[in-house]
């Protein structure tokens, strides 16, 4: 990925960066419009996820997470920007005439060939079951339920590793540090998700952040007591509590957000590192 750094010509472009190689020209039969409902609100219209709202209109790109074009070779035709995710996407032309989008594997270039199946080479971009992969393989777009399509490791730069296979299960180490079990029959794609340097980009101005649908962040300590538990006081007053809290009064640091008694609790061997 080539990141272009703007020269300091105006305050809005000072130190702003943009990817100078990836463009967006989606195919009409692989996109559709969608309403962006809620924007951080629940069904009652109450804010549950703060600092979201606005943003530019988006067209959703249909991504092939299942990779069910078995044993048919495809060629990477374009590498495109997708406004719905921080990873890039590739347009694939398959030998039978099918055209689909997939997540862009790191290092893949236009003209490379990919394939999915049970006995395919361990090559970047190929999709195959975990049982056919050697230990230590870097993978992404991992299925949790057989045939449902990839659900894990789809963000830019994500790269879990296959560290063990025993019985009917395979052990994966996820980017978060979590170690969990998954059925060996589930499929995954070889390689790392592209656009690794997405966290090194500088938007350069507030307007670019608003285009992404992200609203300003205000500290609770500078609010009024009616708006936040940290608010109020004379001058630069402390929060007035033993521990920081959310706007709704719950502990802000260290509180577990995972639901209790989930079916997958027995599949997680080690919780993610904070």
Swiss-Prot record:
Residue spans of biased composition, Polar residues class: 7-25
Methyltransferase found in the keyword field: no
MF-aspect GO terms: rRNA binding; structural constituent of ribosome; transferase activity
Cross-referenced InterPro entries: NA-bd_OB-fold, Rib_uL2_dom2, Ribosomal_uL2, Ribosomal_uL2_bac/org-type, Ribosomal_uL2_C, Ribosomal_uL2_dom3, Ribosomal_uL2_RNA-bd_dom, Translation_prot_SH3-like_sf
Location of the region described as Disordered in the Swiss-Prot/TrEMBL record: 1-25, 223-274
Localization terms from the record: Plastid, Chloroplast
Main location: plastid
GO cellular component: chloroplast; mitochondrial large ribosomal subunit
GO biological process: mitochondrial translation
SMART domains named among the record's database cross-references: Ribosomal_L2, Ribosomal_L2_C
Entry superkingdom: Eukaryota
Keywords: Chloroplast, Plastid, Ribonucleoprotein, Ribosomal protein
NCBIfam families: rplB_bact (TIGR01171)
Self-association state and partner proteins as the record states: Part of the 50S ribosomal subunit.
Entry-linked PANTHER family: LARGE RIBOSOMAL SUBUNIT PROTEIN UL2M, RIBOSOMAL PROTEIN L2
HAMAP family xrefs: Ribosomal_uL2_B
Similarity comment text for this entry: Belongs to the universal ribosomal protein uL2 family.
Protein name as it appears in the record: Large ribosomal subunit protein uL2cy
